[in-house]
Amino acid sequence: MSASDNSPQEAATPSYPTQGERIASGAKRDLLPTNYAPEQARILFVHAHPDDETSSTGATMAHYAQKGTEVYLITATRGELGEVIPPQLQHLEVGKPGCTDNGEALGEYRVGELNGALEALGVYHHFFLGQEPATAEGVPVLYRDSGMAWGPNGKPIANPVSSDSSLTAQPLEPQAQALVAAIHEIQPDVLVTYDADGGYGHPDHVRVYEIVKRALEILGDDEDRPLLTWGIEGEYDPKDTRVQAAIFGDGTAKRKAMEAHRTQITVLDDKTFEYSNKVPQKISAVETYRVLD
């Protein structure tokens, strides 16, 4: 869940789902297809911004990496519009004194943070959407963070001043084609991304879900189509009849990865973190998912 947030209006306290709080009876304990050995499998995670992979799925990524699974990550943007927590780095934040660009320097800095987080998680295969191998017809594209604002109900709304090069402003079809190209290259057995609501509603998270959905439509019955696709569970819904998976992952690796994302996340103690909005959240080693496909 990225802290990307250029808020032009007063809003209610931000609202986030609590991870791993409700586990359905009969929930799976594995994201892999039945009888798949972890050391022979590949999982592809598709996220919107640097830090999302850690806060939403970090314990799961570390869990499978430790089991010998090939874990891949595609990140859609570099998080150029994120808020910055450390005072000594706030010149990187768009709109703050000292910022002389449109978030490019922050994006570069966050790429470095992402590299540190992935090392903590034990993940060594990472690409950006729009860059090889995730390109449509081999044409590289840089997708920018769309940003967001907090609405009066504590839920995200679209950023009214997002750029034309932002992820949500660009057409969906080439983005989906780029993901298809990456899937052909990686050949994952399992794909993990957001559910339709984007987890907590960030416009870029919702777009990433739409990209994955369209990519699966394009793939159809192609032999490279992932056997299972999972969506990160947001608020638990007892009426949701889809298969749930609950992964009891590595909370220690997740916390260390969070510490790498210092512009976005403050780790308060072993069990608690917060974004720039100072809403305390649990560092959960349990991460739940619902089957999408």
Question: Predicted segments — roles?
Answer:
Residues 104, 196-199, 240-245:
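Active-site rim elements
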Residues 47-49, 202-205, 261:
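Histidine-centered active-site/metal-ligand motif
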